[in-house]
Amino acid sequence: MSLAQPAGTETLVKPKRPWFSPTTKRRWQNFKANRRGYWSFWLFLILFFLSLIAEFIANDKPILASYKGEILVPVMVDYPEEKFGGFLAQTDYKSSFIQDEINANGWMIWPPIRYSYQTVNSNIPHSAPTAPFWLMDEKERCSAYPQGNADPGCTLGNLNWLGTDNQARDVTARMIYGFRISVLFGLTLTIASALVGVTAGAIQGYFGGWTDLLLQRFIEIWSSMPVLYILLIIAAILPPGFFVLLGIMLLFSWVGFVGIVRAEFLRARNFEYVRAARALGVGNWTIMFRHLLPNAMVATLTFLPFILSGSITTLTSLDFLGFGMPPGSPSLGEMIAQGKNNLQAPWLGLTAFFTMSIMLSLLIFVGEAVRDAFDPRKTFR
């Protein structure tokens, strides 16, 4: 038995909660209104995504191959040469024997650039470093191939678009992989620095007193140290590596976040809603990270793109001085050092310079747009 709904009454429908608050929508609109920063953001994301799939753009292995009816993915799986009738060794897909064997029993799809960052080009027309292929005539660029201009290996994918370095490695491939390492290193360092710096600043600003005094004196002493010299000394002692450099630079990079977060917590810790939360028995850590931290993150977010660009610049500087990534790693700093040592090959320094300039300019434009978006005094139409 069911009760009939009384006449004249309406069922109340709970309104749907919007995905974003009006403040967030206003900030996003302000960010989009800054056209230079908005398009720089998307251009940077596209370049970063392309660098993440660098193995499918620049590689000395085919993306996809078919051999005797079997589909192979050499770019992701290492197949021994024995599979193609050779020896039990790593397969060199650029050798004529392997290419003839696969083409006779199937097909191969190569990436646009048939070189990885560590592939040595043995068909350069003269001693390395060699110029980009478009600075040579057709006869010169194919002179190292057995059949010259008629050789099937002298194709656009096998030519060096931006030349080679002093070890006959493709500059374009090293630029793409170097861009990826620089951005990944900068992002990882920025996120780790933000976690440490925000936590330290929150503790200082919320508790105040002796906690704030002691930590502030420590930070003043720590930040007054010659960072670059200490980085060089530690990097010279420890074996080079991605995570070794990350740990070394994290020792000092977190300090930049402390002052901003500390000031926000000092300002907000005596607000009425904080006092009410304390009176209700809410714990200090809950108040800090659930109620105060969102307000402090506004200033922190505007600071992140500039910290990211600074992290990339520091890594490039260490690589340039020879204290960065391990030898052979794709590095923009190492490419700049090669350009300095090979002034007769200006394409080395110019490639690294323009890559760094574009990357840092995009990050600065994005940082300016984020800063304007979170500024309540600015409203764009």
From Swiss-Prot:
This is Peptidoglycan transport system permease protein YejE. It is a multi-pass membrane protein. It comes from the Bacteria. The lineage of its organism: Bacteria, Pseudomonadati, Pseudomonadota, Alphaproteobacteria, Hyphomicrobiales. It is found in: Cell inner membrane. Residues 179-371 form the ABC transmembrane type-1 domain. SUPFAM superfamilies: MetI-like (SSF161098). Belongs to the binding-protein-dependent transport system permease family. Its main location: membrane. The gene is yejE.
